[in-house]
């Protein structure tokens, strides 16, 4: 029965190793990721459909991240959502079409609503 001793010793050692604490997402994380995705979509569509009238959506995303001060994991998820939004529309459009312009209008409305909801529900 000697082989059980090393296994027990290994189990005891594993139990003594500190486990890093898992970060808990804030309750608005899902909405933030959706907002990041929308901003990425707008970052792609704006130069196609409304190049002179829109703000720099990438800078808006950077400002949002700076304001929220997420940990590295959340920061990467927000950046991933932004990139996913950009990529989704980059696969669909090469020029501004009626559909692209309509998508941009809907995205602007959704971004405004999402930002307002996050602020009204979670701002201090």
Residue ranges of model-derived segments:
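Bacterial N-terminal signal peptides that target proteins for export
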Residues: 1-10
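Hydrophobic helical h-region of N-terminal Sec-dependent signal peptides
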Residues: 10-12, 16
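N-terminal signal peptide c-region/cleavage motif recognized by signal peptidases
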Residues: 18-20
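N-terminal secretory signal peptides
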Residues: 23-64, 115-124
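Compact alpha-helical subdomains of small soluble proteins
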Residues: 54-124
């Amino acid at each position: 029965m000697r082989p059980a001793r090393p296994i027990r010793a290994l189990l005891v050692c594993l139990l003594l190793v500190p486990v890093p604490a898992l970060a808990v997402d804030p309750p608005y994380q899902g909405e933030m990721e959706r907002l990041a995705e929308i901003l990425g979509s707008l970052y792609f569509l704006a130069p196609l459909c409304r190049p002179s009238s829109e703000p720099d959506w990438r800078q808006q995303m950077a400002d949002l991240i700076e304001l929220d001060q997420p940990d590295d994991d959340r920061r990467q998820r927000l950046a991933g959502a932004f990139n996913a939004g950009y990529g989704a529309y980059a696969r669909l459009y090469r020029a501004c079409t009626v559909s692209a312009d309509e998508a941009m209008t809907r995205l602007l409305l959704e971004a405004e609503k999402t930002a307002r909801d996050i602020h009204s529900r979670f701002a201090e």
